[in-house]
């Protein structure tokens, strides 16, 4: 039996895979996500499936959408996956394939599948994956909740126009058929959304600071480029 990977080992593996400094505004985001994913994946009841993959990809891409420099976003994602013993290319493919399955075909059929209705048409073996969630041991996680909701939202947007209504039906119709606490799922989704709002606000502040610094620099350059008045002209004007 392999020993359980420690958090310090996971952190060391991440910083070894990504030795560059992380943008200060996102350092806490990355560290908190790394800790959360570590605790999720070392759980003996953790099960990897496409919904977890979609949740992780959605979480990461949403939180890191405005990261600068942008070319480093994928490098950080790859380092996270490597530290967690996950394959980034497999994660992204599984997430992409799941979304494509949910967006193809009849939205009502896909909705019924997520609700585990007996008459629902199965696609991509998703019914067995969802049924597996009903059989203990199966570890719940915020990442899984985001993955389930993202898959659900791909079909529910055309069925329920209001966000509050979509969330209510998700908790009642999807989570209600799974052994997960609707209250906890709701709280985790709210936390995810509040984190996105907080990052957007921080990003707006940073962008405004950058614009202000740029304007100040332009004023300095404009002042420096003005021609200097000759001394003789200054004496004549003063006389």
UniProtKB/Swiss-Prot annotation:
Coiled coil: 183-219
Protein name: Protein Thf1
Keyword Coiled coil carried by entry: yes
Domain of life: Bacteria
InterPro entries xrefs: Thf1
Keyword Cell membrane (UniProt): no
Encoding gene per record: thf1
One Pfam family it belongs to: ThylakoidFormat
Role played: May be involved in photosynthetic membrane biogenesis.
GO biological process: photosystem II assembly
Keywords: Coiled coil
Composition-biased stretches (Basic and acidic residues): 211-221
GO CC terms: plasma membrane-derived thylakoid photosystem II
Similarity field: Belongs to the THF1 family.
Sequence segments annotated as region (Disordered): 211-239
């Amino acid at each position: 039996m392999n020993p359980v990977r420690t958090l310090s080992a996971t952190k060391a593996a991440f910083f070894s895979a990504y030795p560059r400094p992380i943008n200060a505004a996102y350092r806490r985001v990355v560290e908190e996500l790394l800790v959360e994913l570590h605790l999720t994946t070392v759980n003996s009841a953790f099960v990897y499936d496409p919904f977890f993959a979609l949740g992780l990809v959605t979480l990461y891409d949403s939180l890191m959408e405005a990261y600068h420099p942008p070319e480093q976003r994928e490098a950080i994602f790859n380092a996270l996956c490597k530290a967690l013993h996950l394959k980034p290319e497999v994660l992204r493919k599984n997430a992409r394939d799941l979304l494509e399955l949910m967006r193809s075909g009849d939205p009502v059929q896909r909705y019924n599948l997520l609700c585990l209705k007996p008459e629902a048409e199965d696609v991509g073996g998703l019914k067995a994956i969802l049924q597996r969630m009903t059989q203990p041991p199966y570890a719940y996680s915020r990442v899984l909740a985001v993955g389930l909701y993202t898959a659900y939202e791909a079909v529910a947007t055309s069925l329920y126009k209001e966000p509050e209504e979509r969330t209510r039906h998700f908790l009642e119709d999807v989570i209600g058929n799974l052994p997960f606490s609707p209250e906890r799922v709701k709280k985790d989704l709210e936390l995810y959304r509040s984190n996105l709002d907080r990052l957007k606000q921080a990003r707006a502040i940073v962008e405004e600071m950058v614009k202000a610094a740029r304007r100040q620099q332009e004023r300095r350059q404009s002042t420096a480029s003005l021609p200097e008045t000759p001394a003789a002209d200054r004496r004549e004007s003063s006389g």
